[in-house]
């Protein structure tokens, strides 16, 4: 084992936070220093040259002190027996740099602890603060890291002696293996294997448990029901399917695949042809697929990987739909118990304790969103939608006083994608078809996830909780998706016959499902499975839940094509078996010469005993709201701090929202980028205005008073959130229903039945809306011992509805931004509660630790439909200036958020809403506030009346310029406050979370910036005409120069980059680094090179540095790049990851010696912003005629801060006039202040060019916003092309 020092690992503020935590724990630690240390497992000793190469490869990040400070060593590494995602990616880079004798690289974190001697107990306490026990181990000596590379002989299969010991043997195995088998399932297995005349193996039992777990089989949703002694006519699933039977319109696939599919639009899908690799538009149907999953149990145990693999698993579901599909846009949501932010505890928050083995709600919301965002970011899918609810309270329920909340959290992951018409249905698996595992190797992780997630938290053994934690590698999943993309792009020649993702239960669930769904059996070889841990037993190899894997059936004649695609994308795969005629599973193990699995498929997936739920209805009545202690002014401040209401910027700016170039509506609204969007919208392609929209609805606390009302409200809220997009008819909307319940808890089962019936049998059929997809999680309860007391925390019945729809014109989407620049205006409330104004289970009751009695509900189904149809007319006719639905916090919050987005005031009169101001302002009945022009008010009110809404419409008042927020009732002042004050209250929860998680100085700067009342918002100043197409004369000559659109594994922004160059008149050619390294392509034939954005190698050795070193350490490829850069007629552009990569190639680029490096953002966080930049005077040929222009641009990076050697280096860079772009604030001043400057770069620098101007590198993404519709905000006068299109046309002009 070789040991090499790495870079300093923690920023100063992270060290300060660690020291603070030590102080809180009464540990006398005076200082902490941390640096990375690398361990290399080698097959043979490295030569001096190889060692020097490895050392250079592992030099990234800040420079090291010559010697680490003195102190006691605590070394934190991945848990022995596991392989970290960092290791997988770093080892790949080493191999691509010619270091083939490196078997594996791994990285640890070496802490040097200074201070008085601590006793052994205190050291253990300190070690616990420094590592995640679920994923990491602590050593006190560097040599102990040898354990990371320990190799074991394979363990043999075990047999369970039922023939000798009968039922007791199965019962013991059930406990030992954590199978979570029910008693009737044990009987079933005993009968089955006795009938086969043999003892089952442990792997067969484990496989059965996973395949038949509640998580995988959804037994409760398929159960028979008796309620209050009455047999119910339908299962839960049949009631959901009733929506499809009633309204099958536009649904192409439901209930039978990894995601549902509905009709989309005929558009030009942009991708490279297989023959020449040239990008072009392909006119075809882009149907819409939709899926929403939950990943609750893993997120409770270890939030980052739990949320990351939750998003990753859902993305795989989309990609594995039909015969292969394309994930496009994602969503993430969380329900947790109260945060109790240190120093910011709220009056409604009480600490009820928790089990040791799960983390706190604060930990979940600190780490979980980062994990979900990181996976989406690195994969290259924009996360555009979400929700965040907290609930934890002592409630007087139908069971008396009990604790209700989300100690077991909800972690929601979902999204939409596109699929070709001819790939919607899976193909036929022919006998002899090759059975393939695509993706990473098996590792001993995630064992038992299906069974573990089916238990209430606290029931399973702690070791099984450790075993069920998973690890994420989104860059690997991206490679696999690139393979799937190449396959579906082949159309009728697609080599994929059948595909499923590998999720819960690993291959033990995926492979039987694949062959069974294809009407076949399978014969497999265990030792052909890619395996990074050869010491695993057959059970561990077959059943582990290593992520980023798919199982496929491929025709033998197409294996050569499939192999070629995988090799180019560097996506590992293994052929592990063949499809058989007989529906039988046979798993051979050539190492031991036996068959760990030899069983008929119908034993595994046959008719296991059907569940019967015999339950009783119980529903709390609640208590009338006690108003004596409620002051309206105090209520407003409390509600503005409640996470469900409060600003969620800390959850949004960590997620890339612009990748693909097809995002037309993200969360951030208007020139002031306020996170209040009602829904997410994407364009269907890069050449059309058709699109897709998705929205969320959930009102879980209402279930504590009325199960069915809570479910109806979730559907209603999803509809009111999506209503301001141009959809057309209501039946175009399709829903995903995700049900979370504590099955078995008194009253909850019958409540679940009533809620499903309310939606599936009544509301959705009445609205003609289909629920073609969904998921359930039936173990939403946590048990633990608190002192001598047994405690339980039970979640409310929680239905999360996601609405999906095809959009006619993405430009018609209306946002909550109030307008004061359109003349006199009117604000109208459309109250679908029809004056009921119920306050039960609202934000108001929650912040006063009450529940209330009567909740909101869908009062009139016809009016809800009429409301949607009326909004569609108003949207199509462009009569709406602004729109925002009423939800958590009620009307007051709706108006406030609209005012925040418009940076303006409102004056309203609520007299028409009744005499109860509290109820009028804080009820959460369905509805919306719309802003219209004053002269159109009468017409709008008539249209609403024509749709049956006459009794729901109330004129409130108007939006006004300034900082007022005034609510009156007649002549009485009900509430008056500055809008800017409300804005800061609303922001405080996000600010406090950001301070805890990120650099607190940056968080403070952002909060301070929100107090600038003179902030003009994003604005534009152009020194050229963006409508002028300066490339048109050259395009007319029909000469299309070739641009090499260069990507490395993990790059994800190449398609939109190619589209921008294509529009400017280039032939954009797809060039993978593997093409250059293999000599299939060379740069000699290109005049232009663009290195694209993303996460090459997952950024593990510094952003873009691994990519650069794979060029620098390969002599032939290095010479090729150097020759290209030295040719006097070439152009080169590097964007984001490509910028970082090219900055590390500066020794090859003439005139680039002053270029900086790009390092970790000052905030120490990934930053996704829509930032204002100014084009500086520079030689850049890409920026010609743009100098002095100021305009917003997409920013998405974690390492974008300019790093120079010293002040002299910075001065030389400036004096050379090589700075091409700078961040400016909304006042147009160059800035280093966060977040206007999102990475902290000196002098606002964010793009530099070479002396000749032929090579330019920039961190922002012009290719994602070259279309006007792809800008989060833009001036209304812009046409199809945004001003950023000029960059690409400048390039075309330069080539003549």
UniProtKB/Swiss-Prot annotation:
Residues 1043-1296 form the Glutamine amidotransferase type-1 domain. The active site is at 1136 (nucleophile), 1261, 1263. Pathway: Purine metabolism; IMP biosynthesis via de novo pathway; 5-amino-1-(5-phospho-D-ribosyl)imidazole from N(2)-formyl-N(1)-(5-phospho-D-ribosyl)glycinamide: step 1/2. Its main location: cytoplasm. It comes from the Bacteria. ATP binds at residues 306-317, 677, 887. It is found in: Cytoplasm. This is Phosphoribosylformylglycinamidine synthase.
């Amino acid at each position: 084992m070789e040991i090499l020092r790495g870079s300093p690992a923690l920023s100063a503020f992270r060290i300060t936070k660690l020291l603070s935590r030590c102080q809180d724990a009464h540990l006398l630690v005076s200082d902490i220093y941390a640096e990375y240390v690398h361990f290399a497992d080698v097959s043979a000793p490295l030569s001096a040259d190889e060692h020097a190469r490895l050392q250079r490869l592992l030099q990234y990040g800040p420079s090291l002190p010559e010697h680490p400070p003195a102190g006691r060593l605590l070394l934190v590494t991945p848990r022995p027996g596991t392989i970290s995602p960092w290791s997988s990616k770093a080892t790949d880079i080493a191999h691509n740099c010619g270091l083939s004798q490196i078997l594996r690289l791994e990285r640890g974190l070496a802490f040097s602890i200074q201070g008085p001697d601590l006793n052994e107990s205190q050291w253990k306490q300190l070690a616990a603060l420094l590592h995640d026990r679920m994923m990491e181990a602590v050593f006190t000596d560097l040599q102990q890291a040898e354990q990371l590379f320990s190799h074991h002989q394979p363990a043999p299969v075990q047999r369970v002696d039922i023939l000798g010991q009968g039922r007791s043997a199965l019962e013991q195995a059930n406990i030992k293996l954590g199978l979570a088998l029910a008693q009737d399932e044990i009987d079933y297995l005993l009968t089955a294997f006795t009938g086969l005349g043999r003892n089952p193996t442990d792997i067969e039992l484990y496989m059965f448990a996973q395949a038949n777990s509640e998580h995988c089989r959804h037994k409760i949703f398929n159960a028979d029901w008796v309620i209050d002694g009455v047999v119910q006519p339908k299962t839960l699933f049949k009631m959901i399917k009733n929506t499809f039977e009633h309204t099958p319109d536009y649904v192409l696939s439901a209930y039978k695949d990894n995601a549902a599919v509905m009709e989309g639009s005929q558009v030009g899908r942009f991708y490279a042809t297989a023959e020449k690799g040239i990008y072009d538009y392909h006119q075809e149907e882009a149907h819409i697929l939709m899926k929403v999953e939950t990943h609750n149990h893993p997120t409770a145990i270890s939030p980052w990987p739990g949320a990351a693999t939750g998003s990753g698993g859902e993305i795989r579901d989309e990609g594995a739909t039909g015969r292969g599909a394309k994930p496009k846009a994602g969503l993430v949501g969380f329900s947790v118990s109260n945060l109790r932010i240190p120093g910011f505890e709220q009056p409604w928050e009480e600490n009820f304790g928790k089990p040791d083995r799960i983390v706190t709600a604060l930990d979940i919301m600190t780490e979980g969103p980062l994990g979900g965002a990181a996976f989406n970011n690195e994969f290259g899918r924009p996360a555009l939608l979400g929700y965040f609810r907290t609930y934890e309270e002592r409630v007087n329920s139908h069971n008396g006083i009990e604790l209700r909340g989300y100690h077991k959290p909800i972690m929601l992951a979902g999204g939409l994608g596109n699929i070709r018409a001819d790939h919607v249905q899976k193909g036929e698996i022919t006998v002899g078809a090759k059975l393939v595992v695509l993706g990473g190797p098996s590792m001993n992780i995630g064992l038992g996830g299906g069974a573990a997630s089916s238990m209430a938290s606290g029931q399973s053994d702690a070791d099984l909780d450790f075993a069920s934690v998973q690890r994420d590698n989104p860059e690997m999943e991206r490679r696999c998706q690139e393979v799937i993309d190449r396959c579906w792009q082949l159309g009728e020649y697609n080599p994929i016959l059948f595909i499923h993702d590998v999720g819960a239960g690993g291959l033990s669930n995926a492979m039987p499902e694949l062959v069974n769904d294809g009407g076949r059996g399978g014969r497999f070889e265990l030792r052909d499975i890619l395996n990074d841990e050869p010491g695993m037993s057959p059970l561990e190899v077959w059943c582990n839940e290593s992520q980023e894997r798919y199982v496929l059936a491929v025709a033998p004649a197409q294996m050569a094509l499939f192999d070629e695609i995988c090799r180019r994308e560097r996506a590992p795969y293994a052929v592990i078996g063949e499809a058989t005629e007989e529906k039988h599973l046979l798993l051979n193990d050539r190492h031991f010469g036996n068959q760990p699995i030899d069983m008929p498929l119908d034993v595994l997936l046959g008719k296991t005993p059907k569940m019967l739920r015999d339950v009783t209805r119980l529903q709390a009545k609640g208590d009338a709201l006690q108003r004596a202690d409620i002051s309206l002014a105090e209520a407003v401040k409390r509600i503005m701090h409640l996470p469900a209401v409060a600003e969620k910027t800390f959850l949004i700016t960590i997620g890339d929202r612009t990748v693909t170039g097809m995002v037309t509506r993200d969360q951030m609204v208007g020139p002031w980028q306020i996170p209040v969007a009602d829904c997410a919208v994407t364009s269907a392609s890069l050449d059309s205005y058709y699109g897709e929209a998705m929205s969320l609805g959930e009102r879980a606390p209402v279930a504590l008073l009325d199960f069915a009302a809570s479910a109806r409200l979730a559907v209603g809220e999803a509809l009111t959130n999506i209503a301001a997009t141009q959809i057309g008819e209501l039946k175009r909307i399709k829903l995903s229903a995700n049900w979370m319940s504590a099955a078995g808890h008194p009253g909850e089962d019958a409540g679940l039945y009533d809620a499903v019936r309310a939606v599936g049998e009544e509301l959705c059929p009445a609205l003609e809306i289909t629920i073609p997809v969904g998921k359930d999680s039936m173990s939403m309860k946590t048990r633990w011992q608190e002192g001598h007391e047994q405690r339980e925390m039970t979640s409310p019945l929680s239905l999360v509805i996601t609405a999906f729809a095809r959009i006619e014109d993405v430009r018609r989407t209306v946002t909550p931004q109030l307008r004061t620049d359109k003349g006199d205006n009117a604000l109208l409330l459309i109250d679908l509660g029809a004056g009921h104004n119920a306050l039960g289970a609202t934000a108001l009751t929650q912040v006063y630790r009450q529940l209330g009695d009567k909740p909101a509900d869908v009062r009139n189904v016809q009016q809800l439909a009429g409301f949607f149809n009326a909004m569609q007319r108003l949207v199509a006719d462009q009569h709406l200036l602004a729109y925002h639905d009423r939800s958590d916090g009620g009307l007051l919050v709706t108006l406030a958020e609209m005012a925040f987005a418009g940076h303006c005031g409102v004056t309203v009169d609520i007299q028409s809403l009744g005499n109860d101001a509290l109820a009028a302002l804080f009820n959460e009945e369905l509805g919306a506030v719309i802003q219209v022009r004053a002269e159109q008010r009468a017409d709008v009110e008539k249209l609403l009346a024509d749709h049956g809404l006459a009794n729901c419409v109330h004129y409130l008042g108007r939006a006004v310029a300034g900082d007022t927020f005034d609510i009156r009732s007649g002549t009485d002042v009900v509430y008056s406050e500055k809008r800017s004050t409300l804005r800061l209250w609303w922001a405080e929860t996000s600010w406090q979370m950001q301070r805890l998680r990120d650099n607190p100085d940056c968080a403070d700067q952002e909060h301070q910036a929100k107090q600038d009342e003179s902030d003009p918002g994003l604005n534009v100043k152009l020194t050229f005409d963006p409508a002028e197409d300066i490339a048109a004369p050259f395009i007319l000559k029909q000469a299309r120069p070739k641009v090499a659109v260069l990507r490395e594994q993990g790059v994800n922004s190449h398609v939109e980059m190619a589209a921008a160059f294509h529009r400017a008149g280039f032939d954009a050619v797809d060039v993978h680094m593997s093409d250059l390294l293999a000599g299939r392509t060379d740069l000699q034939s290109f005049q232009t090179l663009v290195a694209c954005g993303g996460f090459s190698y997952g950024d593990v050795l510094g952003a873009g540095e691994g990519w650069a070193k794979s060029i620098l350490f390969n002599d032939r490829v290095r010479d090729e790049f150097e020759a290209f850069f030295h040719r006097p007629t070439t152009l080169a552009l590097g964007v984001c990851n490509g910028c970082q990569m090219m900055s590390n190639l500066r020794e090859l680029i003439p005139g680039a010696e002053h270029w900086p490096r790009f390092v970790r953002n000052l905030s120490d966080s990934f930053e996704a912003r829509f930032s204002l930049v100014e084009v500086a005077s520079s030689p850049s040929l890409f920026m010609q005629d743009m100098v002095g222009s100021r305009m917003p641009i997409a920013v998405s990076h974690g390492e974008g801060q300019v790093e120079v050697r010293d002040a002299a280096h910075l001065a030389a860079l400036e004096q050379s006039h090589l700075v091409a772009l700078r961040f400016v604030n909304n006042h147009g001043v160059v800035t280093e202040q966060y977040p206007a400057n999102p990475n902290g770069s000196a002098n606002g620098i964010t793009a530099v060019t070479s002396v000749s101007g032929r090579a330019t590198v920039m961190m922002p993404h012009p290719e994602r916003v070259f279309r006007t519709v792809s800008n989060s905000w833009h001036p209304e006068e812009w046409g199809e092309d945004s001003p950023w299109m000029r960059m690409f046309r400048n390039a075309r002009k330069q080539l003549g």
